[in-house]
């Protein structure tokens, strides 16, 4: 029998992805090369600005300013940090996006901004490359999705795991303060 056929059909060679680390690195390199995760103003607007002598916004400075504003308000209100679920708030804090309409209605992606500590983004597995461009996310962890659609009868266990992860962040970076701001869950 022909080795390129299986029965009457041609043989489809299986995809061999290699290691998870290699796939993640390839995703990061591709995202950086294509600059596909930075939403911009577009070529027409950039040309108009150049024609009018208007400089493009300094995105790294803007990201730093936004994070400083968040932390100043958290400090003023004596919070250890903020837990963000709203995709607009996550975008403001981290300048990263991932399936905005979906996560607007399903608690699957979130972010913790410590008042005096790291910005930890909880995202879908292997989506680290979606926030690499921003330079303000200190760590990306896999999100623990505790909604029934994802966890079914394991929801109680997932909620406890999620809560323990948030409590650990607050204990590690809250300086003894256990109060956090939450936009919504």
Residue ranges and their predicted role:
Residues 1-185:
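A composition/biophysics-driven feature that prefers long, compositionally simple stretches
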């Amino acid at each position: 029998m022909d080795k390129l056929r299986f029965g009457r059909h041609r043989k489809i060679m299986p995809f061999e992805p290699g290691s998870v680390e290699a796939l993640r690195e390839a995703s990061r390199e591709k995202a950086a090369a294509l600059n596909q995760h930075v939403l911009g103003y577009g070529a027409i607007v950039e040309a108009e600005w150049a024609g009018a002598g208007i400089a493009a916004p300094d995105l790294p400075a803007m990201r730093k300013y936004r994070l400083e504003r968040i932390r100043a308000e958290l400090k003023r209100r004596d919070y250890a940090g903020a837990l963000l679920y709203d995709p607009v708030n996550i975008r403001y804090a981290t300048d990263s996006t991932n399936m905005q309409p979906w996560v607007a209605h399903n608690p699957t992606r979130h972010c913790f901004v410590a008042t005096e500590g790291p910005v930890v983004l909880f995202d879908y597995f292997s989506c680290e490359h979606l926030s690499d461009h921003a330079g303000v996310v200190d760590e990306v962890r896999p999100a623990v999705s505790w909604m029934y659609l994802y966890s079914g009868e394991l929801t109680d266990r997932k909620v406890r795991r999620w809560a323990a992860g948030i409590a650990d962040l607050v204990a590690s970076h809250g300086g003894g303060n256990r109060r956090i701001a939450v936009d919504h869950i």
